[in-house]
Amino acid sequence: MKKINIIKIVFIITVILISTISPIIKSDSKKDISNVKSDLLYAYTITPYDYKDCRVNFSTTHTLNIDTQKYRGKDYYISSEMSYEASQKFKRDDHVDVFGLFYILNSHTGEYIYGGITPAQNNKVNHKLLGNLFISGESQQNLNNKIILEKDIVTFQEIDFKIRKYLMDNYKIYDATSPYVSGRIEIGTKDGKHEQIDLFDSPNEGTRSDIFAKYKDNRIINMKNFSHFDIYLEK
């Protein structure tokens, strides 16, 4: 009987300790919004690599090595890391366009990006996007023609960057004094589907590599299927 009572007491103490500690663990695991903004402001204050009609030197199961000599000089290249499924769509000597954000920079030989690759497109186009902005659930001015894309096939990385850049320039979403604490982009297609992009996601240590790794899938969209974008910001 004594043994049973001791076991009960130990069990009760354990439950109390767990319930006391759990909230602390939860709050510590969530990165403070000021740190998230700081990470994202640093990561996206960047000039993207925007190169046209470059040749693929070689490909592996997860990497494309792309010749950018005509832009950067002899023996200069871009190394694009991507998922296996994405990399299999390209092969050696393919001509591609690059729009990517570097996470490692080696000024002597090349840059390292995630995804950011589309087939080379020689036609000149101007797609002026239709967009809407909502702040704390209230509709603001429309953002029609604020974002322009100059290719028929683009990566979500390019759309994401250009919309973020507009928001950073005009709404200061990542500034320390910014009132915004969460937000997302929703990209609508003509078949009624929606793709979401979290505007306040800074995983792991919040390095450029951590933040840009989501572009490994090299997701693309044909602008013939693009409908509009919606931005939702919360204070």
Curated annotation (Swiss-Prot):
Family of this protein: Belongs to the staphylococcal/streptococcal toxin family.
InterPro entries given in the database record: Enterotoxin (IPR008992), Staph/Strept_toxin_CS (IPR006126), Staph_tox_OB (IPR006173), SuperAg_toxin_C (IPR016091), Superantigen_bac (IPR013307), Toxin_b-grasp_Staph/Strep (IPR006123), Toxin_bac (IPR006177)
Other facts noted in the record for this chain: This toxin seems to be coded by a bacteriophage.
Organism taxonomic ancestry: Bacteria, Bacillati, Bacillota, Bacilli, Lactobacillales
Binding-site residues, Zn(2+): H194, H228, D230
Pfam families assigned to the protein according to its UniProt record, in alphabetical order: Stap_Strp_tox_C, Stap_Strp_toxin
Molecular function via GO: toxin activity
Gene name tied to this protein: speC
Function: Superantigen that acts as a causative agent of the symptoms associated with scarlet fever. Has been associated with streptococcal toxic shock-like disease and may play a role in the early events of rheumatic fever. Superantigens cross-link major histocompatibility complex (MHC) class II and T-cell receptor (TCR) molecules, resulting in an overstimulation of T-cells associated with a massive release of pyrogenic and inflammatory cytokines.
Cross-referenced PROSITE patterns: STAPH_STREP_TOXIN_1 (PS00277), STAPH_STREP_TOXIN_2 (PS00278)
Cross-referenced Gene3D superfamilies: 2.40.50.110, 3.10.20.120
This protein's record includes keyword Isomerase: no
Protein name as annotated: Exotoxin type C
Alphabetical keyword list: Signal, Toxin, Virulence, Zinc
Gene Ontology terms: cellular component: extracellular region
Organism name: Streptococcus pyogenes serotype M18 (strain MGAS8232)
Signal sequence residues: 1-27
Disulfide bond entries: none
Protein's UniProt keywords contain Signal: yes
